[in-house]
Amino acid sequence: MAIVHTLPVPLEPARETATAPKTPAMGSVSSLISGRPCPGGPAPQRHHGVPGPTFFRQQDGLLPGGYEAQEPLCPAVPPRKAVPGNSFTYVNEDFRTESPPSPSSDVEDPREHQAHNAHLRGPPPKLIPVSGKLEKNMEKILIRPTAFKPVLPKPRGAPSLPGFLGPRAAGLSGSQGSLTQLFGGPASSSSSSSSSSAADKPLALSGWASGCPSGTLSDSGRNSLSSLPTYSTGGAEPTTNSPGGHLPSHGPGRGALPGPARGVPTGPSHSDSGRSSSSKSTGSLGGRVAGGLLGSGARASPGSSSGGDRSPPPPPPPPPSDEALLHCVLEGKLRDREAELQQLRDSMDESEATVCQAFGARQRRWPRERGEDCAAQAQQATQRVQRAQQLLQLQVFQLQQEKRQLQDDFAQLLQEREQLERRCATFEREQRELGPRLEETKWEVCQKSGEISLLKQQLKESQAELVQKGSELVALRVALREARATLRVSEGRARGLQEAARAREQELEACSQELQRYRQEAERLREKAGHLDAEASGLRDPPVPPATTDPFLLAESDEAKVQRAAAGAGGSLRAQVERLRQELQREQRRGDEQRDSFEGERLAWQAEKEQVIRYQKQLQHNYIQMYRRNRQLEQELQQLSLELEARELADLGLAESAPCICLEEITATEI
């Protein structure tokens, strides 16, 4: 339902539209992308006025080279001040419906496009590719959405011009609303234009849909719009009776209404220059066509001005001319294009809202991810730095140890060098000191060599004398060996005699022991014999009379019996005593004989012992004499050697002190 109010046209344009281009040109679909409000707020309402100049203005604090400032993606639009005393036009949003996504587009594409288009005011950042289309269009700065609303089929009948414009009046701009009033004049022109537009509409729509799949108009559409003739209407402005009031028509230089519609959010619009130029060109073209068809006295019917009522068509007007039909067909095509553009705007709104949400979420997620990445990289860098620091500390410690060890080695080498230098100095000093001593020693060696040659000659003579003395010593040794042999024989004989005497002494001791035993036994036998004599004397007494009948007599008779038995045994004891006495006498005689023999042997052994002792004394005397003779021979040999040396020295004519040199002194001076 479109409610049209009368709006006075201001003589001076608003400040916001002062910088708008005065010569509108047909723009592409991509130039019609407008700034969208943030999703989740009130329902967006379209503002069909001239766009403000701040479309690509850089917002303060929005993406200043980084992601530190987190500001809202779509800042609040300040409301515009309403002009007092003006009426407004309400446009029904019939075409603002949910458009399904294109099959060729990805689910994430609208969100990416919305997030990117929300920041068209500043330099857009590089988005991370999430779909195939974004990867293909990464080289482009501006990512254009491709989600379009499909074109609705048009009826095949020939409705009237108000019925044709009724369901589409909500998606048209203010200038197009005025065209609706202008085409409500003659019935023949509206019916013929409706039939011609209905016949040509499918072909035009299909051609436009096939020629503009990427959001831009085709070359043929641009040529057709740019080649339209410019007509100027010279009559009065037609007015249309409507329930909302009176709407004046527009001249060729005015185009669309500059005032904002009621219910549309005031403030600077976010649409670009292409969209404003397209709306202006459409409005001016509609004004020209309306002026050429109707003239100064045309009036629109109340049913066609409302646009929303399905009233029966008025009586057929007279048939218009060919030029009017052509203008009607073109006007119908333009309305279809505007409706499709409105659908595209709605789809752009939805896609941009999704892209805005995605980009906002990604913008909020980017600092966190960047912070996490930076923290991880910082942690890794810290770990690497710590490992490198530990490695450097270990290397520094090793180098310090090596340096300390090298310093110790260097100090030790310096000490060794000093010691070697001192030793070299000592050796040089000793060499300088030993030089003259070496010369003296060489002279002394020469002198000693002469003395040695002389001594060698004397030694030869002494050796000859020693050979002679040696032969004498050999003869003496032979005599000594013979004397030793005789001495050994005599010693053997003396040793045999000593052994025999020792054996005799042992036998003598054994005999003396046996004699002592016999004496003890004889003493014992004497005592026993005395005892037996005493018993025998007791037995010689008269026998006791026989016992009486008294019991005491019986006891005495027993004792008498014992005495009689003992008297019988006494005779046998006497015989045994006599025999023992005889044996004792024999033993005494044999002991005397053995004593005599032992005494004779002892005397003989004593004589032999004395003889051996005399022989040993004589042998010792001979040894002593031989030792004395050897000493005398040695003294004589030494005396002869001294005399020989003195004689040789006298022959050589040496000093008198020369004979004092002896062998011991020569050996003492040996080098």
From Swiss-Prot:
Chain segments carrying region Disordered: 1-131, 149-324
Subunit structure, interactors included: Interacts with KATNB1. Also interacts with CTNNB1, gamma-tubulin and KIF23.
Keyword field contains Phosphoprotein: yes
Species, as recorded: Mus musculus (Mouse)
Region of interest: Required for centrosomal localization: 1-333
GO biological process: fibroblast proliferation; kidney development; microtubule severing; mitotic cytokinesis; negative regulation of canonical Wnt signaling pathway; negative regulation of fibroblast proliferation; negative regulation of protein localization to nucleus; negative regulation of Wnt signaling pathway
Chain positions with Phosphoserine modification: S249, S296, S572
Disulfide bonds: none
Chain coiled-coil ranges: 329-651
Entry protein name: Leucine zipper putative tumor suppressor 2
Bias type Gly residues, positions: 284-295
Main location: cytoplasm
Biased composition (Pro residues): 311-321
Region of interest called Sufficient for interaction with KATNB1 and for inhibition of katanin-mediated microtubule severing, as start-end residue ranges on this chain: 452-671
Keyword rRNA-binding: no
Cell compartment(s), UniProt: Cytoplasm; Cytoplasm, Cytoskeleton, Microtubule organizing center, Centrosome
Pfam families associated with the record: Fez1
Biased composition (Low complexity): 187-199, 242-283, 296-310
This protein's UniProt keywords: Cell cycle, Cell division, Coiled coil, Cytoplasm, Cytoskeleton, Microtubule, Mitosis, Phosphoprotein, Wnt signaling pathway
